[in-house]
Amino acid sequence: DRLNANIVVNQPRAMVFGETAFATDIRDQEFTGTDKEYLHRFIVCAAHTTTSIDEIWFDDKLAWDGTSVQGEFVGYLDVTTCLEGTAGAAVNISARMGTSRRYTGMTYVYFRYKLTGNSKKAESPFSSSVPTRITIKGKGMPTYDPRLDSTVTGGSGAMRADDQSTWAWDDDASRNPAVQAVTALLGWRINGLLSVGKGIPPRRIDLESFITA
């Protein structure tokens, strides 16, 4: 269940299309603080870059609205989103891992939970447990649309099947099953290596057929 955050060592890499709930694959976590009052958790949402992370829900409560922490979680939760992991975006929380948590090319969220109250009378919403049912909503990967590729018969534009830097999110096209299908056939690469999808060379795909699909 992609809405239940957990650690699964053989979890397949996630490919996310359209506007939907992302994967919640816990890749690492650790406690810090004198009394281990902070829990740090890294959740990888997709094995590729994505367009946006718009909302995060814990169970049925909005925890983050795309800009700031909400409701009872204010003062007890920090959220850092990364649409494409790089060395420069790595979060350093302790000497154990330093800046080695890069999740290169992937989309991830870093959570810091404060497990203790901010005063003697206050209680953290995470004092008894940290929610595992997490809904991370957003817009998925940029897609390739042959209608916007002038090298394909019937297409017009600068998008290219063999250059994913030209792919883009579109509110209509990126939710089109035909556009999603051809993007999945092409696959997404990180540093030149196939991360998700089939990785079929464009010359072996009838791109024109996806214009009329």
Predicted regions and their residues:
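Polar, S/T/G-rich
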Residues: 1-213
